[in-house]
Amino acid sequence: MTGRGTSSRFLTSVLHNGLGRYVQQLQRLSLSLSRDAPSSRGAREFVEREVTDFARRNPGVVVYVNPRPCAMPRIVAEYLNGAVREENVNSKSVEEIKSLVQKLADQSGLDVIRIRKPFHTDNPSIQGQWTPSPTNGLPSTGCGPENSGILLQLRCKHSKEPGALDRERDRIGSSFGFQAQAE
């Protein structure tokens, strides 16, 4: 499939999440299951063993358990952005349901789609994206201090021991990638 055929978007933060405090996007979790259907056995065991632990770990999520006669057990997840995800848990084990519920709690409610770029801004800079490299990966132009003959003068005012100037000159010169010259 080509890149133009799949939906995509720029990477954005959901509801500015992370500016201030973290807001979990899962708002409500509803478990519908039958009390006596054999396909609901894993869902019943999940409610008996794991649902209280999940509620303690996620205090911002409201958990509803609806025991009613139904053909297939299901989990309905409602998110803050209005998205609703419905998952069938027919004949699944407790561990599978536990991992599914945790996955629903960790998601944002948005569809999983291709991300165009790992960075995006609404106010782009005319200078381009910032990079810590001064040459931006380009070869050296020969205009740096190692090629222009600039004399590096260092003075160690705080140290009176012999050789301090030479050690400081060597330390600074090697960190900038050129050899310091003596005075």
Swiss-Prot record:
One of its GO terms (biological process) is mitochondrial translation. One of its GO terms (cellular component) is mitochondrion. Its main location: mitochondrion. Residues 120-144, 162-183 are annotated as: Disordered. Gene3D superfamilies: Glutaredoxin. SMART domains: L51_S25_CI-B8. Keywords: Mitochondrion, Ribonucleoprotein, Ribosomal protein, Transit peptide. SUPFAM superfamilies: Thioredoxin-like. Residues 162-172 have a biased composition (Basic and acidic residues). It is found in: Mitochondrion. Ubiquitous with the highest levels in the liver, heart and kidneys. The skeletal muscle, brain and testis showed lower but detectable expression. Expression is coregulated with TWNK. It comes from the Eukaryota. Residues 122-139 have a biased composition (Polar residues). GO terms for molecular function: structural constituent of ribosome. Component of the mitochondrial ribosome large subunit (39S) which comprises a 16S rRNA and about 50 distinct proteins. This is Large ribosomal subunit protein mL43. It comes from Mus musculus (Mouse).
